[in-house]
From Swiss-Prot:
It comes from Vicia faba (Broad bean). It is found in: Plastid, Chloroplast thylakoid membrane. It is a multi-pass membrane protein. One of its GO terms (cellular component) is chloroplast thylakoid membrane. It holds the Pfam family Proton_antipo_M. This is NAD(P)H-quinone oxidoreductase subunit 5, chloroplastic. The keyword Zinc does not apply. The chain crosses the membrane at residues 9-29, 40-60, 89-109, 121-140, 147-167, 185-205, 219-239, 258-278, 280-300, 327-347, 354-374, 396-416, 425-445, 552-572, 606-626, 726-746. GO terms for biological process: ATP synthesis coupled electron transport; electron transport coupled proton transport. It catalyses: a plastoquinone + NADH + (n+1) H(+)(in) = a plastoquinol + NAD(+) + n H(+)(out); a plastoquinone + NADPH + (n+1) H(+)(in) = a plastoquinol + NADP(+) + n H(+)(out). Keywords: Chloroplast, Membrane, NAD, NADP, Plastid, Plastoquinone, Quinone, Thylakoid, Translocase, Transmembrane, Transmembrane helix, Transport. Its main location: plastid. Its EC number is 7.1.1.-.
Length: 746
């Protein structure tokens, strides 16, 4: 065991040779390296597998011994200054290392197929390997300086991958937005680190916690200054984990390749913020106002993320807002002091969300066979539907991930989310009501995604309803940029929707198919395929297809994780049988809500607690099915249902309210617009004023002196022309002026 801990310093550096060797290969042997580019997937996966085995071994030892191992190297610069670097191995490090490596391996396997067509394949694997290195360095850091260094490296890799297709302006803008937003949080984190170093004189976690606790108990520090420093530390996590109000970068980050979206949302970028709060929780718990602030930010993010997800038409942005909401649950749990529940949900959510993103990548891949490379179309759920028979394995995997995130037993997220909801009742009934209501909303928008994508009919075949020809494929440049100029075309989805490509979709999926269409689906497609009215007589229709085995393998492994990973946190203890592996791993742990009670609960208590949360989730599923499942269109044909709709009082007012809520959700709560007006526009005006001030005043003074000297010189050169008469004339003129001046002012 001692040898394993002593060798743990190498964990972050094991994946590092891959980006180094790729860089050297491109420098020395560019042609051979590019021709053999697919071979680099193997060393990337192999080295990360070694780290995973190492991490599992550390976790087993942690369960058996509950030990904390820290090793520090000190570099003394002078008598007053020394730098210390080291690594810390504890329960949090073990959990995060397993999470990073398992998800990372599956994403790399998936990416080998997903990115095989992309000429940036080598660049992608270079970034991914360095991303894993940076995240592993972050979780093994023993002090705040190392945390900040690897924190910035994690951010840098995220920006590179978000803007991976940098020739697309929207991807470049998304990268810039993520960078600028995170600069706010990272600047706060740096100030917080400096503030606590000034207070305690140490940056090592254990020393920092002990010194700070003693200072607080002895009342030897200014509580306002301490609270400000803690708030600044928390700002870093707010930005990195996309918490309100620094969440605006996360949906735009979906412009990167889908595999990196899975890694960012499951185990790296956004998980880093939760990790930092969990690591610094011993520091925060001695400041009650900070804990309350963390819980408040968490519950606001829970609600905001869920409400903004209900009207999105882009499948990846929908999942991004889902991630934002689930991270809010984790932050809420940490703010309540429920350390175990937060980390439990971090684990279960990581595998479920990775499964959903890889599933969405499979869907996007299959849609590209129809629409070509066009993210506005291949990620648009309005154009999907009926993918069940075309991609059955993807459908099954996506459904399992959806049910897990909805909180349906026995899938992973049910166990962790139920624990957070139960703890919220102990913390604040108001927070509990909000959290439980949002759980139902989560079930609604997640099942909405599933129904829009897999149920009904394939809507993309109806996009030529206006009778104009439109090729199914687009000309793609090197980085996926469309060569063809986009046209705004109206899409009529057979009574389902009339919209422009750039406009919103309907909040409810109100399909009104004709009687013939409802009776015979095959006749619909024959009708559309044969009709010359749609301008598609000579154009073949393509259908979505199932992904290849490499991509499906990663998804199926994540399905197994989604089924069974929740069992590690089952807190039942019946007749001497203790199934709670997570509690053993998290010793010592922090739990402010169960200080005087046992962690385990009996089956009856669990059943009572779970019934309520599961009922809310099923209610959300039912509402989503009612509005989005194709059977809803049949209900509209019933006279009783139509009569009910016509006789509902004030239906027009209710429709207006629904449209207002829809617009609010679709436009991201107008938060981006608010930042655009209040911050970006103000900064631009200030920049223009500074530009004017600099050019007209700062530069105007030396420029004015130079110009005046030029004109004076031009005037003087006519005086000294070599004529004696000119000299006498100017001499007499100046003499008379002097005399006149003396006469006026004696």
């Amino acid at each position: 065991m001692e040898y394993t801990h002593q060798s743990s310093w190498i964990i972050p550096f094991i994946p590092l040779p891959v980006p180094i060797l790729i860089g050297v290969g491109l420098l020395l042997f560019p042609t051979a390296t590019k021709n053999l580019r697919r071979m680099w997937a193997f060393p990337s996966i192999f080295l990360l597998t070694i780290v995973m085995i190492f991490s599992i071994d550390l976790s087993i030892q942690q369960i058996e011994n509950s030990s904390i191992y820290q090793y520090v190297w000190s570099w003394t610069i002078n008598n007053d200054l020394s730098l210390e670097f080291g690594y810390l191995i504890d329960s949090l490090t073990s959990i995060m290392s397993i999470l990073i490596t398992t998800v990372g391996i599956l994403v790399l396997i998936y990416s080998d197929s997903y990115m095989s067509h992309d000429q940036g394949y080598l660049r992608f694997f270079t970034y991914m390997s360095f991303f894993n290195t940076s995240m592993l360095g972050l979780v093994t850091s023993s002090n705040l300086i190392q945390v900040y260094i690897f924190w910035e490296l994690v951010g840098m890799c995220s920006y590179l991958l978000i803007g991976f297709w940098f020739t697309r302006p929207i991807a470049a803008n998304a990268c810039q937005k993520a960078f600028v937003t995170n600069r706010v949080g990272d600047f706060g984190l740096l100030l917080g680190i400096l503030g606590f170093y000034w207070i305690t004189g140490s940056l090592e976690f254990r020393d920092l916690f002990q010194i700070f606790k003693n200072l607080i108990y002895k009342n030897e520090v200014n509580i306002l200054f301490v609270t400000l420093c803690a708030l600044l530390l928390f700002c870093g996590s707010v930005a990195k984990s996309a918490q309100f109000p620094l969440h605006v970068w996360l949906p735009d980050a979906m412009e990167g390749p889908t595999p990196i979206s899975a890694l960012i949302h499951a185990a790296t970028m956004v998980a880093a913020g939760i990790f930092l709060v969990a690591r610094l929780l011993p520091l925060f718990i001695v400041i009650p106002s900070i804990m309350s602030g963390i819980a408040l930010i968490g519950i606001i993010t829970v609600v905001l993320g869920a409400t903004l997800a209900i009207a999105q038409k882009d499948i990846k942005k929908n999942l991004a807002y889902s991630t934002m909401s689930q991270l809010g649950y984790m932050m809420l749990a940490l703010g309540m002091g429920s350390y175990r529940a937060a980390l439990f949900h971090l684990i279960t959510h990581a595998y479920s969300k990775a499964l959903l993103f890889l599933g969405s990548g499979s869907i996007i891949h299959s849609m590209e066979a129809i629409v070509g490379y066009s993210p506005d179309k291949s990620q648009n759920m309005v154009l999907m539907g009926g993918l069940t028979k075309h991609a059955p394995i993807t459908k099954m995997s996506f459904l399992i991930g959806t049910l897990s995130l909805c909180g349906i037993p026995p899938f992973a997220c049910f166990w962790s989310k139920d624990e957070i909801l139960n703890d919220s009742w102990l913390y604040s009934p108001i927070f509990a009501i909000i959290a439980c209501s949002t759980a139902g909303l989560t079930a609604f928008y997640m099942f909405r995604i599933y129904l829009l994508v897999f149920e009904g009919y394939l809507n993309v075949h109806f996009q030529n309803f206006n009778g104009k020809k439109n090729s199914s494929f687009y000309s793609i440049s090197l980085w996926g940029k469309e060569e063809k100029k986009k046209l705004k075309k109206k899409i009529h989805l057979l009574g389902f929707l009339t919209m422009n490509n750039n406009e919103r979709t309907s909040f409810f999926r109100e399909r009104t198919y004709s009687h013939r269409i409802n009776r015979n689906v095959k006749s619909i497609r024959r009708l559309f395929l044969d009709s010359t009215h749609f301008g598609t007589k000579n154009l073949p229709f393509f259908y979505p297809h199932e992904s290849d085995n490499t991509m499906l393998f990663s998804m199926l492994v994540l399905v197994l994780f989604t089924f069974f990973v929740g069992s590690i946190g089952i807190s039942f203890s019946q007749e001497g049988i203790d199934l709670d592996i997570l509690s053993k791993l998290l010793i010592p742990s922090i739990d402010l809500l169960h200080q005087n009670s046992k962690n385990s609960v009996d089956w009856y208590e669990f059943f009572i607690n779970a019934t309520f949360s599961v009922s809310i989730a099923f209610f959300g599923l039912f509402i989503a099915s009612f509005f989005y499942k194709p059977v809803f269109s049949s209900l509209q044909n019933l006279n009783l249902f139509n009569l009910f709709q016509k006789n509902v009082p004030k239906k027009i007012i209710s429709d207006k309210i629904i449209n207002i809520l829809y617009d609010w959700s679709y436009n991201r709560g107008y938060i981006d617009a608010f930042f655009e007006v209040s911050l970006i526009a103000s900064v631009r005006k200030l920049a223009k004023f500074n530009y004017f001030f600099d050019r007209q005043l700062i530069d105007g003074i030396p420029n004015g002196v130079g110009i005046s000297n030029f004109f004076i010189g031009e005037a003087i050169k006519y005086v000294g022309g070599g004529r004696i008469s000119s000299y006498i004339f100017f001499f007499v003129l100046i003499f008379l002026l002097i005399c006149y001046y003396i006469y006026l002012f004696p």
